C-alpha cells in the first residue's frame, strides 16, 4: 500500500502534495471566475482560514479570459477545474494555473489531450485525474456497476491516456457521495497507485450532514495513512470546508495550527451559561492560528481532573470559578471576570508562541 509518506511528490507551485505526512488543504470558490473581485474575496478568505490551494471553475469564455487576473492577484496557487473543453485547460495553464483538474475521458480529441499533456509538462503543471462515481464510463458501469472496481479501472484507463503522451505528473481522486464506497475506492486506489490521492466525499450535503458524512468516510482512510490532500465538499460557505478539515485533521493529530476549544456536555451541576461562554471563546480564537487546547467545564467538581490534557481552561460556578493550567488550579476568580481572564491567558499563550517561533 502507498501511504502518504510513500506516494510520489507533486508540486502545485511551491506546495508539495505527496511524499510527506502533511495533508494539503484545499477548497473551491463558488463565485463565477469571471467575477474577479468576488473570486479573489473568496480566495483570500480561504487562505486566511488555512487553505493551501484553491480551485476555480472555468465554465465559459468569460471565465477563461478572467483566469490570469485571478491568478496574478491570488495569495496561493490556483487550480483550474475543467470539464469537456480542452481549450480551457490549455488557456488555464498558459494563464498561470498551477494544477489542472480534468477527466481525460471527457476530452474527445486525443490530439487536444496530447497538447494538454505536452504543455503541462512544459510548465511543470500536475493534472488531477478526477474519477467520480456519477461519471463512470458506460462499459464499466454495465460490467461492474457503481463499484470501487469500476472506479479504479476507469482511473487506470485515464492514467494510461496521459502516460501515452509522456505525462506522469498526476494526482488521483476517486469521489462518490457514499462514505462506504469512497472508503473502498480509496483503499483500493492506495494499493494500485503510487500517485498522491486527493480525498473527498462529493455531494456530501449541508454543513452538519456533509460534515458527518465526510468525517465518517475520510477518518478511517487518514488513520491508515491514505490521502495526501483533502477537500471537504459542503453546500455552504467554502470557508466552512477548511474549518471542518482543520478540526477533523486536528482530532487525528494531523494538524496543529489551531486553538482547540473543548467543553463538557453539562449536567445538573451547571451554574452558568456554558453554551454562551463556549461560543464566545470559539469566536475569540477563530483567527489565532497556533496550537493550544482550551477547556471550558461546567463545575469545579470534575473540572481540573477532566482537563488535564488541556493547556489552559476554566471551570465556572455560581459566584466564583477556577482557572487551571495542565489540570492544576492556578487561581480562583469571580464568575463575572472568568471569561475575560481566560481570554487574557489565551493571548499570553499566543504571544509566547509568536516569540518562540520568531513571528
UniProtKB/Swiss-Prot annotation:
InterPro entries, A to Z: Dihydropteroate_synth-like_sf (IPR011005), Enolase-like_C_sf (IPR036849), IspG_bac (IPR016425), IspG_bac-typ (IPR004588), NO2/SO3_Rdtase_4Fe4S_sf (IPR045854)
Cofactor(s) demanded: [4Fe-4S] cluster
Pathway membership, UniProt: Isoprenoid biosynthesis; isopentenyl diphosphate biosynthesis via DXP pathway; isopentenyl diphosphate from 1-deoxy-D-xylulose 5-phosphate: step 5/6
SUPFAM superfamilies in UniProt: Enolase C-terminal domain-like, Nitrite and sulphite reductase 4Fe-4S domain-like
Protein name: 4-hydroxy-3-methylbut-2-en-1-yl diphosphate synthase (flavodoxin)
Cystine pairings recorded for this chain: none
This protein's UniProt keywords: 4Fe-4S, Iron, Iron-sulfur, Isoprene biosynthesis, Metal-binding, Oxidoreductase
Catalysis: reaction(s): (2E)-4-hydroxy-3-methylbut-2-enyl diphosphate + oxidized [flavodoxin] + H2O + 2 H(+) = 2-C-methyl-D-erythritol 2,4-cyclic diphosphate + reduced [flavodoxin]
Biological process annotations from GO: isopentenyl diphosphate biosynthetic process, methylerythritol 4-phosphate pathway; terpenoid biosynthetic process
Entry superkingdom: Bacteria
Homology family: Belongs to the IspG family.
GO MF, any single term: iron ion binding
Residues noted as binding [4Fe-4S] cluster in the record, renumbered to the chain: 264, 267, 299, 306
Cofactor info, note text: Binds 1 [4Fe-4S] cluster.
EC number, as in UniProt: 1.17.7.3
Keyword Zinc set for record: no
Enzyme class per UniProt: oxidoreductase
Role according to the record: Converts 2C-methyl-D-erythritol 2,4-cyclodiphosphate (ME-2,4cPP) into 1-hydroxy-2-methyl-2-(E)-butenyl 4-diphosphate.
Amino acid at each position: 500500500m502507498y501511504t502518504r509518506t510513500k506516494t510520489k511528490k507533486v508540486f502545485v507551485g511551491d506546495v508539495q502534495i505527496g511524499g510527506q505526512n502533511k495533508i494539503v488543504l484545499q477548497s473551491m470558490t463558488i463565485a463565477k471566475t469571471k467575477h474577479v473581485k468576488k473570486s479573489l474575496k473568496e480566495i483570500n478568505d480561504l487562505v486566511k482560514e488555512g487553505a493551501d490551494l484553491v480551485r476555480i471553475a472555468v465554465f465559459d469564455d468569460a471565465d477563461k479570459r478572467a483566469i490570469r487576473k485571478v491568478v496574478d492577484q491570488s495569495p496561493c496557487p490556483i487550480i483550474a477545474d475543467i470539464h469537456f473543453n480542452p481549450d480551457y485547460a490549455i488557456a488555464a495553464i498558459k494563464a498561470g494555473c498551477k494544477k489542472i483538474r480534468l477527466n481525460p475521458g471527457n476530452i474527445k480529441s486525443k490530439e487536444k489531450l496530447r497538447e494538454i499533456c505536452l504543455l503541462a509538462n512544459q510548465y511543470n503543471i500536475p493534472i488531477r485525474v478526477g474519477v467520480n462515481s456519477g461519471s463512470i464510463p458506460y462499459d464499466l458501469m454495465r460490467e461492474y456497476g457503481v463499484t470501487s472496481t469500476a472506479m479504479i479501472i476507469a482511473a487506470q484507463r485515464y492514467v494510461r491516456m496521459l502516460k501515452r503522451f509522456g505525462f506522469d505528473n498526476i494526482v488521483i481522486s476517486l469521489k462518490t457521495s457514499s462514505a462506504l464506497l469512497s472508503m473502498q475506492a480509496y483503499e483500493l486506489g492506495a494499493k494500485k497507485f503510487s500517485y498522491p490521492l486527493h480525498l473527498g466525499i462529493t455531494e456530501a450535503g449541508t454543513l452538519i450532514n456533509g460534515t458527518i458524512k465526510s468525517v465518517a468516510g475520510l477518518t478511517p482512510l487518514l488513520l491508515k495513512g491514505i490521502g495526501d490532500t483533502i477537500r471537504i465538499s459542503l453546500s455552504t460557505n467554502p470557508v466552512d470546508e477548511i474549518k471542518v478539515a482543520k478540526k477533523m485533521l486536528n482530532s487525528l493529530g494531523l494538524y496543529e495550527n489551531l486553538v482547540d476549544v473543548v467543553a463538557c456536555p453539562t449536567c445538573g451541576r451547571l451554574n452558568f451559561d456554558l453554551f454562551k461562554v463556549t461560543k464566545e471563546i470559539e469566536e475569540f480564537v477563530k483567527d489565532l492560528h497556533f496550537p493550544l487546547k482550551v477547556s471550558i467545564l461546567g463545575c469545579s467538581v470534575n473540572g481540573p481532573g477532566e482537563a488535564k490534557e488541556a493547556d489552559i481552561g476554566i471551570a465556572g460556578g455560581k459566584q466564583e470559578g477556577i482557572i487551571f493550567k495542565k489540570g492544576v488550579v492556578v487561581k480562583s476568580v469571580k464568575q463575572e471576570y472568568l471569561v475575560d481572564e481566560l481570554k487574557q491567558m489565551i493571548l499570553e499563550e499566543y504571544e509566547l508562541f509568536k516569540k518562540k517561533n520568531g513571528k
